Design a protein with these regions (language model features):
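Glycoside hydrolase catalytic-domain groove-lining segments
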Residues: 237-287
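Short secondary-structure boundary segments
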Residues: 91, 162, 261, 287-288
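Generic enzyme active-site microenvironment
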Residues: 86, 192-194, 230-232, 285
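Short, flexible loop segments at the rims of nucleotide/cofactor-binding pockets, characterized by
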Residues: 64-65, 205-209, 233-237
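Active-site-proximal segments of metal-dependent phosphoesterases and phosphodiesterases across multiple
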Residues: 200-214
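Divalent metal-binding pocket/active-site signature
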Residues: 157-171, 202
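N-terminal pre-domain/capping segments
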Residues: 2-152, 168, 175-178, 185, ...
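Short, glycine/acidic-enriched loop or turn micro-motifs at the edges of active sites
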Residues: 91, 197-198, 233-235, 290
Length: 312
């Protein structure tokens, strides 16, 4: 072999070895961080417009100078600010429900290459725990309307408000939910419900006051009523119930979960770890609060986004 060929061969071998070593190191690093790129992780994040509730235009305060965000601009804003292409909206943020408005919303979503993932229904006077028959019928009727709106908007799910689920209303809640989900299935829309604490007396509650149902009661209602769980990582009274509840609820989802960031209250990485153990492959929808994440909603969402990218 000529000296030039020997040197060239040695250089090629050294380059191949170096590239292989770097690729192996990258593979090991990815394995240590869950094996996903940042783009793949961002594809599993969504942002709740509830995070911007204090600055969304309208909501009965048309002249409030602090309300600067037009909800039609939210999909593009979320894409531009955070690189996230999934949006979860409050039903109260829609400024109309007619066909032209929905066409405009769909166009804005399409332009941002974004997907409306869930509409959260927070009706003022009715929920699944409503006791009076006329209230239950109104809950069913309003929910059906928004299920139809989901179809028009290409949204796969609604989030229903379960109310307190105290022992005296659980059976009625099951029946009301079943009537809603029976209709939703014909429209191919999922009906989700999130956990909202409960399981123990509320602070300063009077003696013998009914206890709000915890995650166990919610699961019972979901199973009887044909709904799906929307695990909310933050909404548990303690670590023991969080660990137990998430293991059950992540196995009952339609693909959406609410994720906060409050390290002084609980271990977010541990909670996400439970989702991984159960095999959850759905979305983590960012939910912020001024108490946990500061008064600036844009910075608050950024902080939760950055924290989640490190652990999902």
């Amino acid at each position: 072999m000529k000296r030039r060929e020997f040197i060239a061969g040695g250089l090629a071998g050294g380059v191949a070895f170096a590239l292989g070593t770097r690729a192996q190191a990258r593979g090991q690093a990815q394995a240590q961080t869950g094996g996903a790129s940042e783009a793949e992780k961002l594809a599993r994040l969504s942002v709740m417009t509830y995070c911007f509730d204090r600055i969304v235009k309208g909501l009965g305060k048309p002249d409030d100078p602090d309300r600067t965000l037009d909800i039609l601009d939210a999909p593009q804003m979320i894409t531009d600010h955070y690189g996230i292409h999934h949006v979860e909206m409050q039903h109260t943020h829609f400024q109309a429900t007619d066909k032209p408005y929905f066409q405009e919303m769909k166009g804005r979503l399409r332009k941002a290459n974004s997907q409306l993932t869930q509409i959260c229904l927070e009706f003022d006077f009715v929920d699944l725990s409503s006791k009076q028959k006329y209230q239950q019928l109104e809950m069913i009727a309003l929910s059906k309307d928004w299920i139809d709106y989901c179809v028009q908007l290409g949204c796969p799910r609604v989030l229903l408000n379960q109310g307190p689920l105290t022992p005296d209303v659980v059976e009625d809640a099951k029946s009301t939910l079943k009537q809603i989900t029976d209709y939703a299935k014909t429209q191919k829309v999922f009906c989700d419900i999130e956990n909202r604490g409960g399981g123990r007396p509320a602070p300063n509650a009077p003696p013998n006051a009914p206890v709000r149902g915890g995650w166990e009661v919610l699961v019972e209602v979901l199973k009887a009523g044909g709904g799906y769980a929307n695990p909310d990582i933050g909404n548990f009274p303690d670590e023991e119930s969080r660990a137990a509840g998430l293991r059950v609820m992540y196995a009952m989802t339609s693909g959406n979960s609410h994720a906060h960031y409050a390290p002084d209250r609980y271990d977010e990485a541990k909670a996400i770890g439970i989702a991984k153990e159960v095999g959850y492959k759905g979305l983590f929808s960012i939910e912020t609060s001024a108490r946990n994440n500061g008064p600036d909603p844009y910075a608050a969402v950024q902080s939760v986004r950055d924290a989640l990218l490190k652990i999902i």
